[in-house]
């Protein structure tokens, strides 16, 4: 009799605890429950999406070894951005991201960005300032990323002003050296002869790989270079210090370094959209817009598809993770269960200004979620 009273008490308590709507007949409770479930799922995904965007901002700065986003305005960027063929190629033919499933993986990617191309603008050195008869250009400071990587290509780009009639231009690149008493101040690097036609000016590239490698071996020997480009009448056509209307025509160095390919790991996962009712772990679309952050220092891409993982990992779906399942069986209360996380990620290529106003083209690993799974 006492047991019966206990059962009745429990039953009454359950009736009181249940929402009154749930006791009515009809389809309305089911519809409300489904709507509530969808609403909760949308809220959860929205929170996950916001967290993912904030995490991406932190990861980009960390992987680029930047303590904070470079403070470069759009006006300054217009002045610094070279109007040169190699840079225009990177922007015009920009590969925002690779959808190839064999490209990179979370386990095999390094954490920090892999530099592929560095565009270095000229600066003034103390040696150039102290010289009598200031040379026409240029001193280049090199990033530590160049010093610790193998250089596969190094080109000096110079812009030659337009000519009014067909003419031959004599280009000479000289390397500055410390003079011994009355000795020479320069040694030749490259000399070439160009035939120019009337019209707009042209960009000319010159191979300086050997010189750069010597500078990297002996940094103290890097005192700068001088650029000369005279036509038949002795007019200097090289833009070394841009005048009015010559923004973006500075000489610059384009340096390419090796990039070690990464092995990938194949996996399978679910893909969903924002209207999906899928409750299992799934990959959802997410576009990151750098312009919305005010990150003008990122030249390209202005936005990219990052994606994110969301929803649940139930133990009933864990045949793929026997170790996790066994842990749960052994200690069901102590196990927090698996989480829906990226199981495969791929890099993005990025063209950006670093804190020293150098233009870097590199690969940032693990920035695009390719697949999601429970782990």
UniProtKB/Swiss-Prot annotation:
Sorted alphabetically, which keywords does the UniProt record give? Cleavage on pair of basic residues, Cytokine, Disulfide bond, Glycoprotein, Growth factor, Secreted, Signal
Show the Gene3D superfamilies listed in the entry.
2.60.120.970, Cystine-knot cytokines (2.10.90.10)
Mostly located where? secreted
Q: Which Pfam families did the record assign?
A: TGF_beta (PF00019), TGFb_propeptide (PF00688)
Coiled-coil spans in chain: none
InterPro entries attached here?
Answer: Cystine-knot_cytokine, TGF-b_C, TGF-b_propeptide, TGF-beta-rel
Q: List the disulfide bonds.
A: 272-282, 281-340, 309-372, 313-374
Its subcellular locations are: Secreted
Q: How does it assemble?
A: Homodimer; disulfide-linked.
Q: What does this protein do?
A: Acts specifically as a negative regulator of skeletal muscle growth.
Question: Which family does the similarity line name?
Answer: Belongs to the TGF-beta family.
Q: What is this protein called?
A: Growth/differentiation factor 8
